[in-house]
C-alpha cells in the first residue's frame, strides 16, 4: 500500500512564486489548489492526462514535475477566477479534459498545415524592450488571404487531418500558434510570463467580415478565455479603420468589455508599433527600420518542453495501437 502524498505548506508554496508578491490569503488559496491535485486528476475523463502548456500538473514527486512552473500555472487559473478555489478547480478540470481531447501540442508540433494558413501568422521573440511581457508576440495577418476562400477550404471542419483531430484546420493552426508561443515564456519571470498579440486588419473590410471568420473568431475567443487564463499582456488591433475605433469604447460603455480587459487593448488606425517594440525590431510595414521581413523575424524553430515531447510520444504510440486494433 503506497503512502499518501505529503501536502505542501502555505509558506512552501508561497516561496515558489516569483511572478508576483502573493498575499498570505492568496497563498492559502493556491496551496489548497496544489494540495488538491490528486483529487483534480481523479475527476478527469482521463486521469492520466496531466499536461498544461507542455508542463506536468501533478504531485511534487512525479517525474517531469517542475514545482515552481506548475505552481505558477495553477496561480494563473486561480487568479483568472479571482481566487475562487472552486471555480479555479472546475476550470482546471475542464482545461485538462479539453487538452486530452483536442491535443493542442500535436497541433503545434506534430501537424502540418497548408501554406495559406501558415502565412496568416508569425511568432516573434524580442529582447531588450522597455515594457514587460512584450517579448513574445503572436501576429495575425488577416489581410494575407481572402477570408471567404480561407474558411471555405479550412473552416467548418473542412479538410481535417487524417487522424480526425477535433476542430477545423484553421482552429488547429491557430491553437498551435498559441501553444508554440508559450514555449518561449518563462512562467517564473514577471517580465516574461505572458505574451502579446497583434491583429493586423490591413486590407480587411471591417464591414464585410466573412461569416466563417466571425464564427471561427468567436470559437477561438471562447477557447482562449476558457483554457489560456492570465497569459495575455496586451492585444494590439492595428490598421483598424477610424470609423470602427469607437466600437471598443462603446462596448466598454455598455459593459460588453470589462475595464480590466479593455486596458489590455491597443486599437490603432495605423500599423506603427514602434512605441512598444522599438524601430530596430520592426520592418517598415510597422514603422520600423529593420531590413528583416516578418517572415524572417518569425521564430521558425521552437523547442517543446521535455514533458511535452513525452506526451506526443505517448500519443503517437496510442494511435499506432489504435490502427493495429482496427486492422486486426
From Swiss-Prot:
Family annotation (Pfam families): CRAL_TRIO
Cofactors: heme b
Domain CRAL-TRIO intervals: 129-294
UniProt-annotated location(s): Cytoplasm; Endoplasmic reticulum membrane; Microsome membrane
Family from the record: Belongs to the SFH5 family.
PROSITE patterns xrefs: CRAL_TRIO
Reactions it catalyzes: a 1,2-diacyl-sn-glycero-3-phospho-(1D-myo-inositol)(in) = a 1,2-diacyl-sn-glycero-3-phospho-(1D-myo-inositol)(out)
Keyword Ubl conjugation attributed: no
Gene Ontology annotations of biological process type: Golgi to plasma membrane protein transport; phosphatidylinositol metabolic process; regulation of establishment of cell polarity; regulation of exocytosis
GO molecular function, one term: phosphatidylinositol transfer activity
Assigned keywords, A-Z: Cytoplasm, Endoplasmic reticulum, Heme, Iron, Lipid transport, Membrane, Metal-binding, Microsome, Transport
InterPro entries for the chain: CRAL-TRIO_dom, CRAL-TRIO_dom_sf, CRAL/TRIO_N_dom_sf, Sfh5
Keyword DNA-binding annotated: no
Chief localization: cytoplasm
Role played: Non-classical phosphatidylinositol (PtdIns) transfer protein (PITP), which exhibits PtdIns-binding/transfer activity in the absence of detectable PtdCho-binding/transfer activity. Regulates PtdIns(4,5)P2 homeostasis at the plasma membrane. Heme-binding protein that may play a role in organic oxidant-induced stress responses.
Domain of life: Eukaryota
Membrane topology: Peripheral membrane protein
Protein name in UniProt: Phosphatidylinositol transfer protein SFH5
Positions annotated to bind heme: 142, 174, 199, 201, 235
One CC-aspect GO term: endoplasmic reticulum membrane
Source organism: Scheffersomyces stipitis (strain ATCC 58785 / CBS 6054 / NBRC 10063 / NRRL Y-11545)
Amino acid at each position: 500500500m503506497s503512502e499518501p502524498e505529503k501536502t505542501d505548506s502555505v509558506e512552501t508554496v508561497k516561496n515558489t512564486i516569483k511572478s508576483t508578491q502573493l498575499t498570505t490569503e492568496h497563498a492559502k488559496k493556491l496551496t489548497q489548489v496544489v494540495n488538491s491535485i490528486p483529487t483534480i486528476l481523479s475527476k478527469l475523463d482521463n486521469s492520466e492526462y496531466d499536461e498544461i502548456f507542455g508542463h506536468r500538473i501533478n504531485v511534487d514527486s512525479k517525474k517531469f514535475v517542475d514545482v515552481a512552473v506548475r505552481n505558477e500555472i495553477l496561480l494563473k487559473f486561480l487568479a483568472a477566477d479571482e481566487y475562487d478555489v472552486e471555480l479555479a478547480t472546475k476550470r482546471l478540470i475542464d482545461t485538462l479534459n479539453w487538452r486530452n481531447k483536442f491535443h493542442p501540442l500535436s497541433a503545434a508540433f506534430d501537424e502540418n498545415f497548408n501554406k495559406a494558413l501558415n502565412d496568416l501568422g508569425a511568432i516573434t521573440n524580442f529582447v531588450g524592450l522597455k515594457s514587460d511581457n512584450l517579448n513574445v508576440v503572436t501576429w495575425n495577418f488577416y489581410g494575407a488571404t481572402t477570408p471567404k476562400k480561407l474558411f471555405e477550404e479550412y473552416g467548418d471542419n473542412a479538410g481535417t487531418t487524417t487522424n480526425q483531430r477535433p476542430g477545423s484546420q484553421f482552429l488547429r493552426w491557430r491553437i498551435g500558434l498559441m501553444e508554440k508561443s508559450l514555449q518561449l515564456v518563462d512562467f517564473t519571470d514577471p517580465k516574461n510570463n505572458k505574451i502579446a498579440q497583434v491583429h493586423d486588419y490591413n486590407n480587411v473590410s471591417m464591414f464585410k467580415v466573412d461569416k466563417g471568420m466571425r464564427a471561427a473568431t468567436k470559437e477561438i475567443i471562447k477557447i482562449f478565455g476558457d483554457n489560456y487564463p492570465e497569459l495575455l499582456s496586451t492585444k494590439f488591433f492595428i490598421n483598424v479603420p477610424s470609423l470602427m475605433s469607437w466600437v471598443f469604447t462603446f462596448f466598454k460603455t455598455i459593459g460588453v468589455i470589462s475595464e480590466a480587459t479593455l486596458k489590455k487593448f491597443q486599437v490603432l488606425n495605423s500599423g506603427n508599433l514602434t512605441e512598444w517594440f522599438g524601430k530596430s525590431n520592426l520592418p517598415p510595414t510597422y514603422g520600423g527600420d529593420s531590413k528583416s521581413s516578418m517572415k524572417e523575424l518569425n521564430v521558425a524553430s521552437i523547442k517543446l518542453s521535455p514533458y511535452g515531447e513525452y506526451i506526443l510520444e505517448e500519443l503517437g504510440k496510442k494511435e499506432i495501437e489504435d490502427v493495429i486494433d482496427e486492422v486486426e
